[in-house]
Curated annotation (Swiss-Prot):
Name of the protein described by the UniProt record: Adenylate kinase
Pathway assigned in UniProt: Purine metabolism; AMP biosynthesis via salvage pathway; AMP from ADP: step 1/1
Amino acids binding AMP: 33, 38, 59-61, 86-89, 93, 130, 141
Pfam families: ADK
Species of provenance: Synechococcus sp. (strain CC9311)
CDD domains: ADK
GO MF assignments: adenylate kinase activity; ATP binding
Domain of life, source organism: Bacteria
Free-text note on domains in this protein's UniProt record: Consists of three domains, a large central CORE domain and two small peripheral domains, NMPbind and LID, which undergo movements during catalysis. The LID domain closes over the site of phosphoryl transfer upon ATP binding. Assembling and dissambling the active center during each catalytic cycle provides an effective means to prevent ATP hydrolysis.
């Protein structure tokens, strides 16, 4: 199975669930950028202190800082496979990530795109019961996702890395479809 992966997909497609399962089953390291940022802050590293300062001001952490944290994490893996989730979110970030991965001799082997009809996504997200998840907010999140992510999807499609997977059905059925395209 391919060992260096990116996960893309709309909110509610099951990226977190599938990432955890695949990483557990195949010994991959799950690199969620949100989790990585929180871990760096918690550890009190220089990168974490910089990230904390930015987040405390209510600002977005810069791409360069996220890339530095990703680079530090990947550099410490000693050849272990990985699954990057939550980054890159746009083509500019992807174009910044690619040379970093080449430098580490860890290029992306596959980009998994979890696809699901909007109606099913809305149903899934509403069933989570989160306060901020009403249908209007969810529909807007899906529009924003499509606008921001379509060029990124095309970027990886043109590079021959994109693997689309239908994200409907049972968790196990989806996992098997993902494993099938990564074999």
């Amino acid at each position: 199975m391919k060992q260096r992966l990116l996960f893309l997909g709309p909110p509610g497609a099951g990226k977190g669930t599938q990432a955890a399962l695949l990483c557990d089953r195949h010994g991959l390291r799950h690199l969620s950028t949100g989790d990585l940022l929180r871990a760096e802050v918690s550890a009190g590293s220089a990168l974490g202190q910089e990230a904390e300062s930015v987040m405390n001001r209510g600002e977005l952490v810069s791409d360069s800082l996220v890339l530095a944290i990703v680079k530090a994490q990947l550099g410490a893996l000693n050849g272990q496979g990985w699954l990057l989730d939550g980054f890159p979110r746009n083509v500019a970030q992807a174009e910044a990530l690619d040379p970093l991965l080449q430098e580490l001799n860890q290029p992306i082997e596959a980009v998994v795109l979890l696809e699901l009809d909007d109606a099913v996504l809305i149903e899934r997200l509403l069933s989570r019961g989160r306060d901020d998840d009403n249908e209007a907010v969810i529909r807007n999140r899906l529009v924003v996702y499509a606008d921001k992510t379509e060029p990124l999807i095309e970027h990886y499609r043109q590079r021959g890395l994109l693997q689309s997977v239908e994200a409907h059905g049972s968790i196990e059925a989806i996992t098997e479809r993902i494993e099938g395209v990564l074999a």
